[in-house]
Amino acid sequence: MGVLAAAIAIGLAALGAGIGNGLIVSRTVEGIARQPEARGMLQTTMFIGVALVEAIPIIAVVIAFMVQGR
């Protein structure tokens, strides 16, 4: 049962991160298209957002290993 829970947790976290990253990048591209002079600031904010979104699957993998280790 623990293996199934770990697989579901990792899968859902990866799905959410993929959707989140897609939204972040698409909105950044839209912003750069509207205001090219704000490119640097938008890219910096995008990278911070992507890093925060990617932390969720990493935490899910750690929790999955903890569940399997019991």
Swiss-Prot record:
Entry superkingdom: Bacteria
Membrane topology: Multi-pass membrane protein
Subcellular compartments: Cell membrane
SUPFAM superfamilies per UniProt: F1F0 ATP synthase subunit C
GO MF term set: lipid binding; proton-transporting ATP synthase activity, rotational mechanism
Keywords: ATP synthesis, Cell membrane, CF(0), Hydrogen ion transport, Ion transport, Lipid-binding, Membrane, Transmembrane, Transmembrane helix, Transport
Alphabetical list of Gene3D superfamilies matching this protein: F1F0 ATP synthase subunit C
Pfam families to which the protein is assigned, alphabetical: ATP-synt_C
Keyword ATP-binding attached: no
GO CC, one annotated term: plasma membrane
Transmembrane segments: 5-25, 47-67
Site (Reversibly protonated during proton transport): E54
Subunit structure: F-type ATPases have 2 components, F(1) - the catalytic core - and F(0) - the membrane proton channel. F(1) has five subunits: alpha(3), beta(3), gamma(1), delta(1), epsilon(1). F(0) has three main subunits: a(1), b(2) and c(10-14). The alpha and beta chains form an alternating ring which encloses part of the gamma chain. F(1) is attached to F(0) by a central stalk formed by the gamma and epsilon chains, while a peripheral stalk is formed by the delta and b chains.
NCBIfam families registered for this protein in UniProt: ATP_synt_c (TIGR01260), PRK06876.1 (NF005363)
Protein's job: F(1)F(0) ATP synthase produces ATP from ADP in the presence of a proton or sodium gradient. F-type ATPases consist of two structural domains, F(1) containing the extramembraneous catalytic core and F(0) containing the membrane proton channel, linked together by a central stalk and a peripheral stalk. During catalysis, ATP synthesis in the catalytic domain of F(1) is coupled via a rotary mechanism of the central stalk subunits to proton translocation.
Family: Belongs to the ATPase C chain family.
Protein name according to UniProt: ATP synthase subunit c
Organism: Geobacillus thermodenitrificans (strain NG80-2)
